[in-house]
């Protein structure tokens, strides 16, 4: 991909967008090429590229204050743009299309700071470089406009969840990335949504520390242990964030390995075995999701799950146990769980180009709905 790919768009039936997402887990970049002018998104191509180890290490480091952050951040942003550009090329090759066939790319970037309480959120990205490499208009920086309007800037996917999954009965849509967030869909009410707490961010960090594996495949490490009820209660009671009322959001700024180690050190019970901690963390995710849904008084009939956690059968069983209602992946509703977030950012890019406000005050607490994103023409 280079500047030779720039040029007038050819005619392709429908309006095509690309959505790119790299989440809190920092394990890779997901991309979808999608047609958005029908009643439901039509995925034409999908790709998931692993995060290069050196780039992942830099992004992890940038989640904590340190020296020379500005240059490191700029270089990491360029590296992420090149990874995104590879994903775009792969999507176009799969679909047999050219850059001119695509209206825009919605590129989320990589969150390295999320402090709406201080009036900012920072997603590392180099959208100008991505536009240059891809030869396609790029929409980026989706969260800042909502924060400027007094909102949390997260979660942003509830209006997309509503467009896809709302029906005649109350339903919850749960995204299990690094952080868990839930969308509550109730007939006759605007969607509500908020973060519920850690999901894969703690599970991955603990698994990496004790097994050397980047994540707990199929929940096998957790299955070797047992849930420690006293430790679970300690983890919940020691963190004031869990008791906050929505709107609320969080991220790796709060929930990280240091957070967990500090609480394990303060735990007054016997030193737990690593596999028992993993099992307890899995229950922590499910329990805090259930607590948040119960506190909302939404009473969803079922829960649709998307994100990487939907592929963890152990975590899905814990959710069913804690929620006491049907829990199933969004695949069962016709939308692959792995691609929901990338699809959402394609949808948000379309909303930005059409100047349609996509932020929901009932979700983020913003003063009003705003058009989200900034445009970087190719």
Curated annotation (Swiss-Prot):
Residue runs in coiled coils: none
Residues noted as binding ATP in the record, renumbered to the chain: 23-30
Gene3D superfamilies found in the cross-reference section: 3.30.420.40
E.C. numbers: 2.7.1.170
Pathway it works in: Amino-sugar metabolism; 1,6-anhydro-N-acetylmuramate degradation; Cell wall biogenesis; peptidoglycan recycling
Alphabetized InterPro entries for the sequence: Anhydro_N_Ac-Mur_kinase (IPR005338), ATPase_NBD (IPR043129)
Physiological role: Catalyzes the specific phosphorylation of 1,6-anhydro-N-acetylmuramic acid (anhMurNAc) with the simultaneous cleavage of the 1,6-anhydro ring, generating MurNAc-6-P. Is required for the utilization of anhMurNAc either imported from the medium or derived from its own cell wall murein, and thus plays a role in cell wall recycling.
NCBIfam families named among the record's database cross-references: PRK09585.1-3
Protein family (similarity comment): Belongs to the anhydro-N-acetylmuramic acid kinase family.
Name of the protein this chain belongs to: Anhydro-N-acetylmuramic acid kinase
């Amino acid at each position: 991909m280079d500047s030779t790919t720039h040029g007038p768009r050819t005619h392709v039936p429908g309006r095509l967008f690309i959505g790119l997402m790299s989440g809190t887990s920092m394990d890779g970049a997901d991309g979808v090429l999608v047609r958005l002018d029908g009643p439901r998104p039509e995925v034409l191509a999908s790709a998931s590229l692993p995060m290069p180890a050196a780039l992942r290490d830099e992004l992890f480091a940038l989640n904590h204050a340190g020296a020379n952050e500005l240059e490191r951040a700029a270089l990491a942003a360029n590296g992420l743009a090149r990874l995104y550009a590879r994903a775009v090329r792969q999507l176009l090759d799969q679909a047999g299309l050219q850059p001119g066939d695509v209206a825009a790319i919605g590129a989320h970037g990589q969150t390295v700071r999320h402090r709406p309480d201080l009036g900012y959120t920072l997603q590392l990205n180099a959208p100008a470089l991505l536009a240059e490499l891809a030869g396609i208009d790029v929409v980026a920086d989706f969260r800042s406009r909502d924060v400027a309007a007094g909102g949390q800037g997260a979660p942003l996917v509830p209006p997309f969840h509503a467009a896809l999954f709302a029906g005649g009965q109350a339903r919850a849509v749960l995204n299990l990335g690094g952080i868990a967030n839930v969308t509550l869909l109730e007939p006759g009410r605007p969607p509500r949504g908020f973060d519920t707490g850690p999901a894969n961010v703690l599970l991955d960090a603990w698994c990496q520390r004790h097994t050397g594996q980047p994540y707990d495949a199929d929940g096998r490490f957790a299955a070797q242990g047992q849930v420690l009820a006293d430790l679970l209660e300690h983890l919940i009671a020691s963190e004031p964030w869990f008791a906050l009322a929505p709107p609320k959001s969080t991220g790796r700024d709060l929930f990280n390995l240091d957070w967990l180690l500090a609480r394990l050190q303060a735990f007054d019970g016997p030193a737990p075995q690593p596999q028992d901690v993993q099992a307890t963390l899995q229950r922590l995710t499910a329990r805090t999701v259930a607590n948040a849904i119960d506190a909302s008084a939404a009473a969803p009939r079922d829960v649709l799950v998307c994100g990487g956690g939907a592929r963890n059968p152990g975590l899905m069983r814990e959710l069913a146990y804690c929620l006491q209602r049907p829990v199933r992946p969004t695949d069962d509703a016709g939308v692959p769980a792995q691609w929901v977030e990338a699809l959402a950012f394609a949808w948000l890019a379309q909303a930005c180009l059409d100047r349609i406000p996509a932020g929901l005050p009932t979700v983020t607490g913003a003063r009003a709905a705003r058009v989200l994103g900034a445009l970087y023409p190719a």
